[in-house]
Amino acid sequence: MRYHALTCIGSFNTRLLGAVAAAATLLAPVYAHAQSAPMLTKALPADGYYANSYPPGAPFRSWLDMVSASQAAQPNWMTPLVTVTPRLEQEFRYDQYDQKNGTGSQGNGQRLISYGGPGGARVELIPSYDWEVILAPPPYVTASGPKGMAAGFGDWPAFLVKYRLAYGNAEHGDYIVTAFFQMTDALGTDGKISTNVTTAQPTIAFGKGWGDFDIQSTVSVQIPVEALNVPGGPSAQTNIRNFGDPILWNTAFQYHLFKYFWPELEVNYEHWSNGEHVGLTQVLLTPGLILGRFPIGYDTPTRPINLIIGAGYQIAVTANPVTQNNFVGTFRITF
């Protein structure tokens, strides 16, 4: 049974919200065709997206032309390992997490191995000029430790939608500001795999580049909207209350070196003003290296398909953390 924090509605409404948001985003190009085109920094072919809507017989090519123009108008940085980039991306992405939680009073001591990472094995799409939608199945997670052994699907990252507010490529200021909205649905898997709380997460993201160096940052709050009753465990109301409203601030400092090398250092900050971790501030440092973009093919004669790989290691630098350390690996194919 689920308990809704506001009106006691069921989980169907959460899934319906996700479906409506995803459908609206995917249909955005239909609306976009009726609008005047934004100022572009890259010319499009005569049969491109803004020349004549979707030309008969070439809708896929026309859509890719639009995606190319959209990405050419923003900074060309690499997506960090943990911080969600404010850039609009179009790619398949798979992450691997091996996380060890803290053993003090704030942690539960569990080791969680996530196949897909918290975002799941996901597809990121740019359906219209300033929009991105991320869709993913739940990640598969194994757990071991003092809270028991378990395996199953982690909480479902139902959708994440981005809207780009302001931006300029390297020739026009090298900056970007983007708004996100994400819903994550609790699936209730044992072994502390699930939080048992469905959350909404509004985010503001921004970045600035100076030559080969850039900073990308996000600030967000996780808002619990409903929760599960755990058989033999906490009630849904208790799970809502324990979760709190944590504030997350992630920042990546990144440098581009020798064409394919992107070393970075991320600072991952989280603070709980209420809930079971009330008063706790946790900071993780994540040094990492991303390699790419390696061309492995072409969508169109001018749009490459790229391979990206990377790895990093998160480690807590504050006392009594919820998360002690975490190995992060990433594999991506842009298209």
Regions found by a protein language model. Give the residues of each.
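Cleavable N-terminal export/targeting peptides
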Residues: 1-60
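Transmembrane beta-barrel domains of Gram-negative outer membranes and organellar outer membranes
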Residues: 34-335
